[in-house]
């Protein structure tokens, strides 16, 4: 797709094994931000990433998938139609990896720096304590960018990372404004 140079982008990241609350929050938040003209950037993975991309598309917004593999591979496979819709709607699926590169585990933390670097701010919806989303948050902070985290249940494994970010000073996200 063709993107405007000065379009503002927000990263929305989180757990692949998200709760129903997190999935709904990611999609709703992405839809509201896309309706305000912001481009949603995420990694295209299952869970929060997928729902963020879908939320942006629901409101006819622009979204960018940053893949951790070559563009001739689709990961996860079930998102092939979603990635086509992203491109057809004026967004993009991008990767720093050459054709033929599989989605290896070491590629995901590396692609997170691109997600953080493309966005004016990063929102972590849900994340465990050992989550790649926390790597994205750290990279965003290293670049001097704001990091928002959605508060979650103290009993939820998928909220331990976001609650940890809040204790460290992340901006609490309680609405899309």
Describe every region a protein language model picked out.
Residues 1-177:
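Glycine-biased, small-residue-rich flexible motifs in mid-sequence functional cores and linkers
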């Amino acid at each position: 797709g063709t993107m405007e140079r000065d379009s503002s982008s927000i990263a929305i990241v989180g757990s692949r094994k998200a709760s129903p609350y997190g999935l709904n929050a990611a999609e709703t938040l992405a839809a509201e931000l896309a309706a305000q003209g912001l481009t949603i950037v995420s990694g295209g993975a299952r869970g929060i990433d997928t729902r963020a991309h879908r939320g942006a598309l629901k409101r006819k917004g622009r979204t960018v998938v940053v893949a951790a593999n070559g563009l001739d591979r689709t990961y996860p496979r079930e998102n092939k139609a979603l990635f086509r819709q992203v491109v057809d709607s004026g967004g993009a699926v991008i990767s720093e990896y050459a054709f033929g590169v599989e989605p290896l585990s070491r590629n995901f933390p590396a692609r997170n720096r691109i997600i953080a670097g493309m966005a004016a701010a990063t929102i972590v919806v849900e994340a465990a304590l050992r989550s790649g989303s926390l790597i994205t948050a750290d990279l965003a902070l290293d670049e001097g960018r704001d990091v928002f985290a959605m508060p979650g249940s103290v009993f939820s494994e998928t909220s331990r990372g976001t609650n940890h970010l809040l204790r460290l000073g992340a901006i609490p996200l309680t609405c899309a404004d």
